[in-house]
Amino acid sequence: MLEIAGKKFDSHLIMGTGGATSQTLLEKALVASGTQLTTVAMRRFRAGNTPSTAGASNGAAGGESVFGLLNRLGIDVLPNTAGCRTAKDAILTAQLAREALGTNWVKLELIADDRTLLPDVVELVDTCEMLVANGFEVLAYTSDDPVVAKRLEDAGAAAVMPLGSPIGTGLGILNPHNIELICARASVPVLLDAGVGTTSDAALAMELGCSGVLLASAVNRCQDPVAMATAMRHAVEAGRLAAAAGRIPKRTHAQGALASSSFEGLASWDEDWAEEVL
């Protein structure tokens, strides 16, 4: 069970909508993933929509919007501040989300570099603190720096979301040691966000101690999004179960230089018998 800010989810997989080639394919992938929480950029929202009436604004002309789709599927919306570069922009975007969608949850993204989409950790902590003071539950997208993650937690973040690698790269978890450190020290959920390329990345995140995984490109930009969404669902669950089971220690050789099975009961060489036969 994934619990964030007092709300419980059966699924530990959070999906994103960016990069989907069609609304129909997005819907099938979301259902296949089993997700119960999906993030959407507020820049896709148009005035006049509500979660239940967001009919034709953001999809094809005359079609259902992504907000309407999520509402119909019973998936909670996690609005994000993608594209914001300053605290002012992020706070205004969060306020828009609260007014338009009726939620005080926000995924805080402050981008420092348009090419890499890496987060601005200098602005991030202060912005998080201001949003929390204004009644928001902040899920903060951050670097894989354990110090920054801890400062976000101290600022009141409901969850910290360190990247595995830059958004959309599919490079996986480049610094597993740091992710493991963040998880070990955090008292709020740690959600791996960005860089997942395939199922092994998602499973590893859970094995390192993450409470959940957020991904978009790995599913929405692959050759078969529905199949990959299904695979990611199982990968996250497998990683979670493996972490709970506890892996064996890593060693340079077998413990005590002995094989894992006893030699008891195995056939032995009898010299006297061998002489008679030979």
Curated annotation (Swiss-Prot):
Keywords on this record? Cytoplasm, Schiff base, Thiamine biosynthesis, Transferase
- Which positions are annotated as binding 1-deoxy-D-xylulose 5-phosphate? 168, 194-195, 216-217
For molecular function, the Gene Ontology terms on record are: thiazole synthase activity
**Keyword Transferase set for record:** yes
The answer to keyword tRNA-binding applying to this record is no
Query: What CDD domains does this protein's entry cite?
Result: ThiG (cd04728)
Alphabetically, which GO biological process terms does the record hold? thiamine diphosphate biosynthetic process
Protein EC: 2.8.1.10
- Kindly tell me the pathway this chain contributes to: Cofactor biosynthesis; thiamine diphosphate biosynthesis
Q: What is its subcellular localisation?
A: Cytoplasm
Q: Which reaction does it catalyse?
A: [ThiS sulfur-carrier protein]-C-terminal-Gly-aminoethanethioate + 2-iminoacetate + 1-deoxy-D-xylulose 5-phosphate = [ThiS sulfur-carrier protein]-C-terminal Gly-Gly + 2-[(2R,5Z)-2-carboxy-4-methylthiazol-5(2H)-ylidene]ethyl phosphate + 2 H2O + H(+)
Family, per entry: Belongs to the ThiG family.
Description of how the protein assembles with itself and partners: Homotetramer. Forms heterodimers with either ThiH or ThiS.
Q: What is this protein called?
A: Thiazole synthase
Q: Which organism is it from?
A: Corynebacterium jeikeium (strain K411)
What lineage does the source organism belong to?
Bacteria, Bacillati, Actinomycetota, Actinomycetes, Mycobacteriales
As recorded in Swiss-Prot or TrEMBL, the protein's gene is named: thiG
